[in-house]
UniProtKB/Swiss-Prot annotation:
Gene: rnz
Protein name: Ribonuclease Z
Entry similarity comment: Belongs to the RNase Z family.
Organism: Listeria welshimeri serovar 6b (strain ATCC 35897 / DSM 20650 / CCUG 15529 / CIP 8149 / NCTC 11857 / SLCC 5334 / V8)
Reactions catalysed according to its record: Endonucleolytic cleavage of RNA, removing extra 3' nucleotides from tRNA precursor, generating 3' termini of tRNAs. A 3'-hydroxy group is left at the tRNA terminus and a 5'-phosphoryl group is left at the trailer molecule
Cofactor binding annotation: Binds 2 Zn(2+) ions.
Length: 306
């Protein structure tokens, strides 16, 4: 899995940063892309990346502020023009369905695919055999969600060396054993596949937050995550201002990462007051509290579990 930061700015686009959108590329895991927020010009950013709209499966909106949703109608329309035909599910706060449907209706846009809207409440909002997604409220003046994406543990690897050491050669039988089946060999031996499968591989956890001030629900959403994506609209000494504007600072994000025992913190939603040089200072500030911190720039790609 990879996180592709399509927009990393706060509020309005700047020369260096577009407004918020993050793609979670799951091509190896499920051959799809999930999108988190869709600020204005997200589709332009996608054209500059390796992301394909045809692979888009789900869109998760954190909150209804314009810098997180104004790119949706255009992106959905372009996907249709490009021949996209698979269903997309959009998750988000109450109002997301009305916003999208009204924009498409008033612009006379007819899509070639179905959209399913899921206006969410805190709790488990999606689960299949591979992943689950949990949402919870943050604190931002308007309703704002954080998302916790949990990859389910994968089956352990088949111990081929152990099998060969016992005179069992590779072939179709290996797949049956990998599936945990009990197999009778030509020589009469009965082999239980479960005895040749290693420990399960722990699935990854990614926590992606919308805009928020410091709030208690953050800890559980972030706990033990492989990657925490957190806004850092302000530098560390502007905690009072951040609270008044319902945003967070670099140090608040870093302290949460440390407390939640995450493996990596990625800062995004950077105010336009901070140019590239000033952004480097933000990173140094956060690293003073939580060393494994990165600051995202537009089109940056991060491997999950790297």
């Amino acid at each position: 899995m990879e996180l592709v930061f399509l927009g990393t700015g706060a509020g309005v686009p700047s020369r260096g940063r577009n407004v918020t959108s993050i793609a979670l590329s799951m091509l190896n895991e499920r051959k799809t892309i999930w999108l988190f927020d869709c600020g204005e010009a997200t589709q332009h950013q996608i054209m500059r990346s390796q992301i394909k709209l045809s692979k888009l499966e789900k869109i998760f909106i954190t909150h209804m502020h314009g810098d997180h949703i104004f790119g949706l109608p255009g992106l959905l329309s372009s996907r249709s023009f490009q021949g996209g035909d698979s269903t997309i599910t959009i998750y988000g706060p109450a109002g997301i369905a009305e916003y999208v449907e009204t924009s498409l209706r008033l612009s006379g846009t007819r899509l070639t695919y179905k959209i399913i809207f899921n206006e969410i409440e805190p709790g488990l909002i999606f689960e299949d055999k591979m992943f689950s997604v949990i949402a919870d409220d943050l604190e931002h003046g308007v309703r704002s969600f954080g998302y916790r994406i949990v990859e389910k543990d994968k089956q352990g690897a088949l111990n081929a060396e152990k099998l060969k050491a016992e005179g069992i050669e590779a072939g179709p039988i290996f797949q049956k054993l990998k599936n945990g089946e009990v197999v009778e060999l030509e020589d009469g031996r009965v082999v239980d596949g479960k005895n040749y499968i290693g420990e399960p591989q722990k699935g990854k956890i990614i926590s992606i937050f919308g805009d928020t001030k410091e709030t208690a629900s953050e800890l559980e959403l972030a706990l033990n995550a492989d990657i925490l994506v957190h806004e850092a609209t302000f530098e560390g000494d502007k905690g009072k201002m951040a609270g008044e504007y319902m945003h967070s600072t670099t140090l608040q994000a870093a302290n949460l990462a440390k407390k939640a025992n995450v493996k990596k913190l990625i800062l995004t939603h950077i105010s336009s007051r901070y140019d590239r040089d000033a952004s480097k200072a933000l990173l140094i500030e956060a690293k003073s509290v939580f060393e494994n911190t990165e600051i995202a720039y537009d089109l940056a790609v991060f491997e999950v579990g790297e």
